[in-house]
Amino acid sequence: MKNLSIENITRACKGTFHGDESILSQEVSGVVIDSRKVQPGYLFVAIDGERVNAHKFIPDTVKAGAMCVVSHEDLGETDFPYILVESTGQALLDIAKLYRDSFDMKVVGITGSVGKTSTKEMIASVLAQKYHVHKTLGNFNNEWGLPITIFDMPEDTEVAVLEMGVNHFGEMRRLSSVSSPDICVITNIGIAHLEFFKTREGILQEKSQMIQDMKNGGSIILNGDDDLLCKMSPVKGVAPVFFGTGSNCAFRADNIEPQGLRGTSCTITLKDGTSFDCLVPVPGIHMVSNAVAGAAVGYTLGLTASEIKAGIESLPSIPGRNHIIETDHMIILDDCYNANPISMKASIDVLNMAIGRKVAVLGNMGELGDTAEVLHAEVGTYAAQQNVDLVCGIGDLTHALVEEASRGTHTQALWFADNESFIQAIPDILKDGDNVLVKASHGMNFPQIVHALEEL
């Protein structure tokens, strides 16, 4: 870590320093919010969780060698230095902004309803052909995760690819004001988090706030196949550039051919008319859109067509996200990290590419509000339309999903109250050679199911 002195940190978060002022000129060697990760020379920011008051762990961090602590509680006279602030959550963002601005680098900001993480991985894979790239860790994309990602940036970072996720109005500006993106990418406007945003237009309004913090001379890259994004007008005098499959897209994919679970082949045409054939090495036609987004960002940052192609074709597979696992008894399509109605249907499409019996193990989709029952039912109908052989619904919200799936002529549908009930039934319902999709919202803990299937 570099260029973060206690004095500059105090100034950045508008805090009041208490303690030995001789350390004000010293630089911290790390910033953490998890007291268990404190090492000598670190700054600990005490952020209270829903169930835990982080301030009670301050003595432990001091014993572990913390140089200083950021607190929103007045700790009075202490034998260790601390910075008193109004809000430690805001202080974390302010310190992250200070650190981000200490780098001479480009920042790619990514948001959208579906595909943020997979698009982030694709863009990072492309840019890594030319630059030292730092990317969001996993899906650390919220008001705590974004700062953690920024603090972990190596000093030689040339491009940061930062994912930003929101589920309430007002959150995006708090994130984008920290990241200050040079390139803004929006993957799509779906129906995730309707419980809070109410309409797709509300989602668009919040997601597009990222562009307000774009740096001068920046670029806006949007999914031209999205019916709302394709209508966006110039923002801050910058006209959007579109990626997708339509004639309105400056970066376009055609000749799209599924290659089973190997991925999808396509031809990608760049803004200057250059085109190349490539294999997107992750199953699902929807992944082609991510590849074209990667091509658009790569082109904008000066990569050649051959570098872009190499980045797309070397995309690593990530557990929980369209991850193929082959065991002695079955093929598992591990897409269990998260779920919404659009991504559920896309994963069913991927399952349909497999050869042999197809099983969809589907769990609750969260944050759908009053539309939850209808949207779960739609997924069940879709599974039946795609002739999935067996649909297993897990969780209270999947009653409607199972009911609609069971109406399919070729589809058997079973409901389970929880993960344990399903796991106990596995020997009775699955067969050797099955292709098994595992997908649900994050809170359903479906990695537990993936692990159980792997252990068979």
For each predicted feature, which ranges?
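Acidic, Mg2+-coordinating active-site environments of NTP-dependent enzymes
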Residues: A12-T16, S71, L75-D79, V185-I332, ...
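Mobile, glycine- and charge-enriched loop segments
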Residues: S35-A46, V133, F151-V159, I348-G369
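Non-catalytic positions within long, well-ordered alpha-helices that form the structural scaffold/packing
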Residues: I58, V62-K63, S176-S177, A384
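ATP-dependent carboxylate/acyl-activation modules
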Residues: I110, P319-R321, G443-H451
